[in-house]
Curated annotation (Swiss-Prot):
InterPro entries: Aldolase_TIM (IPR013785), DHO_dehydrogenase (IPR050074), Dihydroorotate_DH_1_2 (IPR012135), Dihydroorotate_DH_2 (IPR005719), Dihydroorotate_DH_cat (IPR005720), Dihydroorotate_DH_CS (IPR001295). Belongs to the dihydroorotate dehydrogenase family. Type 2 subfamily. It comes from Shigella flexneri. Substrate binds at residues 66, 111-115, 172, 177, 246-247. The lineage of its organism: Bacteria, Pseudomonadati, Pseudomonadota, Gammaproteobacteria, Enterobacterales. Monomer. It is an enzyme of class 1 (oxidoreductase). Catalyzes the conversion of dihydroorotate to orotate with quinone as electron acceptor. This is Dihydroorotate dehydrogenase (quinone). Keywords: Cell membrane, Flavoprotein, FMN, Membrane, Oxidoreductase, Pyrimidine biosynthesis. It is found in: Cell membrane. The active site is at 175 (nucleophile).
Length: 336
């Protein structure tokens, strides 16, 4: 397959520049006959989850296509679902560059992007142009300059604007790169947020005559007690699903490697065991009351199977996709 040669060239570039270059090419072909250049035929393996039918259990995790610019080109590669975002109500530049780092030996990434995106209105316009026939998730967050105490307002603004166009909505309260965001995972702050989100979901369902499920994305760095509390809150508020997990602040598996001390969230292979353990513990706690979407370090069929064995109904890839390319999609969907 050609991807090892493509990767070698891309890895000569700064990580963010490589991403920008790749997306520049994908934008050129998305929605055109040239999508055939990236199209892969993958077997149909339907999965019912959150009241939706997914063509296959493998999705693209949020963060790669933040603004929904390349939905059709990515869909042509065989993903059963694509999660775009994280998007915020207003455009924001994110954190200062450099903010994305490769740990090549560990096949990991560290990012401190900071929800750089062009805003929810721009994303909606891109979604309207897309023809992807899989499940489209839209991941939403708060603007950096919105006080945490008012953070729920940003989620509600985004929900209102994307509801008509989303297959499901992902609530990102677990990025380590927006100051104070992870505090929304705990106690009264979480209950307050989930109450507001559920009420808004009910209002929007009545308005649009369709039910769009809500999934909450959690961190891998939760303690046992925190995980129990999160699970309890999700069940009490009738949330439709949970995405486990986001990136980690833990560096124990990458000590001594180049870039290991960079600030930000670590993803890729070093996250695999940690995220799988969270899924296993979460699955025991939830006992089937809501489905888990497993993400974190999946870079092989074995890693995907481990997530499902731990309790995930669906899985997503991001860093593994960067390191292994489109062939990983076909490999996982075919053999999972």
């Amino acid at each position: 397959m050609y991807y090892p040669f493509v990767r070698k060239a891309l890895f000569q570039l700064d990580p963010e520049r490589a991403h920008e270059f790749t997306f520049q090419q994908l934008r050129r072909i998305t929605g055109t006959p040239f999508e055939a250049l990236v199209r892969q035929k993958v077997p149909a393996k339907p999965v019912n989850c959150m009241g939706l039918t997914f063509k296959n259990p493998l999705g693209l995790a949020a963060g790669l296509d933040k603004d929904g610019e390349c939905i059709d080109a990515l869909g042509a590669m065989g993903f059963g679902s694509i999660e775009i975002g994280t998007v915020t109500p207003r455009p924001q530049p994110g954190n200062d560059k450099p903010r994305l780092f490769r740990l090549v030996d560990a096949e990991g990434l560290i990012n401190r992007m900071g929800f750089n995106n062009l805003g929810v209105d721009n994303l909606v316009e891109n979604v309207k142009k897309a023809h992807y026939d899989g499940v489209l998730g839209i991941n939403i967050g708060k603007n950096k300059d919105t006080p945490v105490e008012q953070g729920k307002d940003d989620y509600l603004i985004c929900m209102e604007k994307i509801y008509a166009y989303a297959g499901y909505i992902a609530i990102n309260i677990s990025s380590p790169n927006t100051p104070g965001l992870r505090t929304l995972q705990y106690g009264e702050a979480l209950d307050d947020l989930l109450t507001a989100i559920k009420n808004k979901q009910n209002d929007l369902q009545a308005m649009h005559h369709k039910y769009v499920p809500i999934a909450v994305k959690i961190a891998p760095d939760l303690s046992e007690d925190e995980l129990i509390q999160v699970a309890d809150s999700l069940v009490r508020h009738n949330i439709d699903g949970v995405i486990a997990t986001n990136t980690t602040l833990d560096r124990s598996l990458v000590q001594g490697m180049k870039n290991c001390d960079q600030t930000g969230g670590l993803s890729g292979r070093p996250l695999q065991l940690k995220s799988t353990e969270i899924i296993r513990r979460l699955s025991l706690e939830l006992n089937g009351r809501l489905p888990i979407i497993g993400v974190g370090g999946i870079d092989s069929v074995i890693a995907a199977r481990e997530k499902i064995a731990a309790g995930a109904s669906l899985v997503q890839i991001y860093s593994g996709f960067i390191f292994k390319g489109p062939p990983l999609i076909k490999e996982i969907v075919t053999h999972i």
